[in-house]
Swiss-Prot record:
Pathway per the UniProt entry: Cell wall biogenesis; peptidoglycan biosynthesis
Uppermost EC category: transferase
Annotated protein name in UniProt: Biosynthetic peptidoglycan transglycosylase
Cited function: Peptidoglycan polymerase that catalyzes glycan chain elongation from lipid-linked precursors.
Keywords assigned by UniProt, alphabetized: Cell inner membrane, Cell membrane, Cell shape, Cell wall biogenesis/degradation, Glycosyltransferase, Membrane, Peptidoglycan synthesis, Transferase, Transmembrane, Transmembrane helix
Enzyme Commission numbers on file: 2.4.99.28
Entry GO MF terms: pentosyltransferase activity; peptidoglycan glycosyltransferase activity
Topological type in the membrane: Single-pass membrane protein
InterPro entries assigned to the protein according to its UniProt record, in alphabetical order: Glyco_trans_51, Lysozyme-like_dom_sf, PBP_transglycosylase, Pep_trsgly
Main location, first listed in the record: membrane
Subcellular location: Cell inner membrane
Substrates-to-products reaction catalysed: [GlcNAc-(1->4)-Mur2Ac(oyl-L-Ala-gamma-D-Glu-L-Lys-D-Ala-D-Ala)](n)-di-trans,octa-cis-undecaprenyl diphosphate + beta-D-GlcNAc-(1->4)-Mur2Ac(oyl-L-Ala-gamma-D-Glu-L-Lys-D-Ala-D-Ala)-di-trans,octa-cis-undecaprenyl diphosphate = [GlcNAc-(1->4)-Mur2Ac(oyl-L-Ala-gamma-D-Glu-L-Lys-D-Ala-D-Ala)](n+1)-di-trans,octa-cis-undecaprenyl diphosphate + di-trans,octa-cis-undecaprenyl diphosphate + H(+)
Regions crossing the membrane: 12-31
Amino acid sequence: MLSTLIRRLSRALLWFVAGSIVLVLVFRWVPPPGTALMVERKVQSWVNGEPIDLQRDWEPWENISDELKVAVIAGEDQKFASHWGFDLPAIQAALAHNERGGNIRGASTLTQQVAKNLFLWSGRSWFRKGLEAWFTALIELFWSKERILEVYLNSAEWGKGVFGAQAAARYHFGVDASRLSRQQAAQLAAVLPSPIKWSASRPSAYVASRAGWIRRQMSQLGGPSYLMQLDSSRKL
């Protein structure tokens, strides 16, 4: 009985490992048709009796403003070009902060956010975190940094039912993602921690201040020229 259960669990684990590897490899080249977060938001809207129409249009790397690419890195993950999916010092700092109490601080890299939004559900359980770590490792192994950022920018939530850079640019500023200015890009990046609560087009004093900080960080990183470092600066 026990041996049968172990064999079945082992077989299920093997299928999961193989399936997840194949899925990550496919999305290395094929645009994901949607994300787990989009499904979650759609289901939540049905449960709440307020169905929403999801807005999302996939745009390739070259059709997204370099200003937005750098703004997102500046605001969310300044070590993106050099790490392998995990920012250990940031994780340690977040754990120490959370142990002291107060608002919970996260330390997710852009790669971890892609893994979570694309494949997993919301939550803070250790099981989900373990799956997130697994998918993060696979993404870093099989995708380029450019691809990771491209998928992130096409999957990030930027408002109620608004997903991806193109939908966000049209919704908040009435322009295409390729034509976003540095200020607009900074405001979009500023609301990423709480895109439902905060508005990029009608920024609160806090969001405006955060956008200003992001612009300064963009300049310190070197602006769009920073993108040349992607896939050439990773540290073992």
